[in-house]
Amino acid sequence: MLNFFAAAPKGFEYSLAQELTEFGATEVKESVAGVYFTASLALAYRITLWTRLASRIVLVIYKGSCESAEQLYNAAYCVDWPAHFSNKSTFSIDFHGTGGFLNNTQFGALKIKDAIVDRFRDDDIERPNVSRVDAEFKVDAHFRNGVITIAMNFSGPSLHQRGYRSTTGEAPLKENLAANMLVRSGWQASPSTLLDPFCGSGTVLIEAALMAADIAPGLQRSRFGFEHWRRHDKAVWQEIVEEAKARASLGVKRCEIKFYGSDIDSRLVALAKRNAENAGVLELIEFKVADALTIAPPAESGYLITNPPYGERLGNVSELLQLYYQLGDKFKKEFGGWKVAMLCSDIELVSSLKLKADKQMKMFNGALECAFNIYTLHANSTRRDTPVLPDGVDIADIAPAFANRIKKNAKLLEKWAKKEGIDSYRIYDADIPEYNVAVDKYLDYVIIQEYMAPATIPEAVTKRRLSDVLLALPSAIGINPNKMIMKTRERQKGTSQYQKLDERKLELITTEYGAKFKLNLTGYLDTGLFLDHRLTRRLVGQKSKGRRVLNLFSYTGSASVHAALGGAKSVTTVDMSNTYIAWAKDNFALNGLQGKQYEFVQSDCMQWIRDCNEQYDLIFIDPPTFSNSKRMEDSFDVQRDHVNLLASLVKLLSPTGELVFSNNKRKFKMDIETLTKMNINVTNIDDVTLPMDYKRNPHIHNTWLITHA
């Protein structure tokens, strides 16, 4: 009898142990990411050909304690390597594990390589060559807790590679993971009609058809690790292969199970058909292009086993939440008598099904931890009695307090926005503390920004509430889910407002009191326009006629545009970011503003103020709450530094000039006493700069008008 280890993804151990036991293996023992077992050579061949779950089978050649580099070398040297492989075969060592004397896997591999080469030489045999790529004989070594295990890769390339897959879709599912889904769902034990409405490249259905038709998953593999093993028995192996071929031919003819697969992507359906044809099971599976939400049950009962899209895989989160909710509704109403088994990594999406799982287990899709949930759907079951809205989501069922509040806000603010001449505004700002989000409308898009929840609230609770928000929004305000954009921000985190998110651009043009501005809804945490400063920008425009205007920390220059449109004699726009200076220039061009009177300066604003010798009639400054950019000489804290900042700016003001100063620090306290002693007048103008859509959050910013005394 020989000792083996069958490796598999984490979470497969129980299923794999059961499979090996059914094959007839003995001394079956589960371990981390695999199972140890004992088998004859013939049984090992059979397991390698027929296992649907293992990723790799290795033959254990040596196992013992190891406490030094010398002991590691000796352990490898004592193996009779010339009896295992020819010196004409190339070899490689795959070493895993560190600890104690061994802190480098390359060193471990090198010691074993030296021992193998020396063993050949000491037996008066020319040494074999090492090949880093595609070696013919592969040694697997594992070092853990002072024990070294040296093995031969018996199976060869990963066993999940059956040989039928031509190419993959965007989010391929490994074949042995699909097989484990079929095993753990209970389908393999009692096969019946099987449906996969998100079939992708067909992996779940093909693996199921291979099971039902008694086809060995390894039949189409062209290479096995034991082929260059000197103790390989070709006759025994060939007998096992021929038996499997005969069973496959008979199994396809006898198979009476019905398989149905569909996907909304016609390209993937075509790929699934090619893969099924390669696997020899195309005649058993009915594929079609269809939306999962329109699929009717193909039988009175059966299994629906699928790997639907989720966050790490495909799709937009708000669209996916809607999809899962509607799937749950469809399953309840139309699939009574069926079992549903779904693989998903996102707990929010799973909970959006609104179904109670019979079983919940963990599986790993590569490195991604997923939930595999199994549901039993009872006949004539409905989720609720209240009517479902056209988009499939009933407001009464999802976050009713939030849905009703934002619906009311949206209706009121839409009329107001039309009168104001704006098309971008806030419709919700954590009005209800449990739903701690801000929702901004930009033309026909909305951006949902989740505030950081207090540490006292469990993460599962905040995730549940957020998914409820995303589910309720489309019906509540009449928005298409694919025009919902989700962002996360923390309150008062310095320059986080300028953080770049990704390279994608979703650009729109918004209108504000006659001015036009370019928005980027996806590239950055903010969009290019701070909506809460809308009235402040208009105020700057109203005060600009015939005046020399300076805009510091200008961001995308929106206040500068209002100043120019307001008739400013000149406008100087200063920001440290080249990106935002370029954006400001785009905004000027968008409004037909050009000329030498409009100056754009990329500079550290604090240093620019110190170096400036010009006079201005109107200055607008909206500095960050805190900044320690590498491009600035010193850090800046608006509370700590505002007196010195304002004193420096007043020096740049003409005798009748005005300074509009604003910031977003929620607990900001203006040092009026010190500024008054410096002959500086300070007047709070929050009441005239807070827009209607921000009345629910009066501390969003504070604004001050400053002049010479």
Swiss-Prot record:
Q: What is its EC number?
A: 2.1.1.173, 2.1.1.264
Enzymatic reactions: guanosine(2445) in 23S rRNA + S-adenosyl-L-methionine = N(2)-methylguanosine(2445) in 23S rRNA + S-adenosyl-L-homocysteine + H(+); guanosine(2069) in 23S rRNA + S-adenosyl-L-methionine = N(2)-methylguanosine(2069) in 23S rRNA + S-adenosyl-L-homocysteine + H(+)
Q: Which residues form the THUMP domain?
A: 43-154
Q: Which UniProt keywords apply?
A: Cytoplasm, Methyltransferase, RNA-binding, rRNA processing, S-adenosyl-L-methionine, Transferase
- Molecular function in Gene Ontology: 23S rRNA (guanine(2445)-N(2))-methyltransferase activity; RNA binding; rRNA (guanine-N7-)-methyltransferase activity
Its main subcellular localisation, reduced to a broad class, is cytoplasm
Q: Name one GO cellular component term.
A: cytoplasm
Q: Does the keyword Cytoplasm apply?
A: yes
Q: Where in the cell is it found?
A: Cytoplasm
List the cysteine pairs that form cystine. Answer: none
- InterPro entries found in the cross-reference section: 23SrRNA_methyltr_KL (IPR017244), DNA_methylase_N6_adenine_CS (IPR002052), RlmKL-like_Mtase (IPR000241), RlmKL-like_Mtase_CS (IPR053943), RlmL_1st (IPR054170), SAM-dep_methyl-trfase (IPR019614), SAM-dependent_MTases_sf (IPR029063), THUMP_dom (IPR004114)
UniProt family annotation? Belongs to the methyltransferase superfamily. RlmKL family.
Q: What does this protein do?
A: Specifically methylates the guanine in position 2445 (m2G2445) and the guanine in position 2069 (m7G2069) of 23S rRNA.
Name-wise, this protein is Ribosomal RNA large subunit methyltransferase K/L
Q: Which organism is it from?
A: Shewanella baltica (strain OS195)
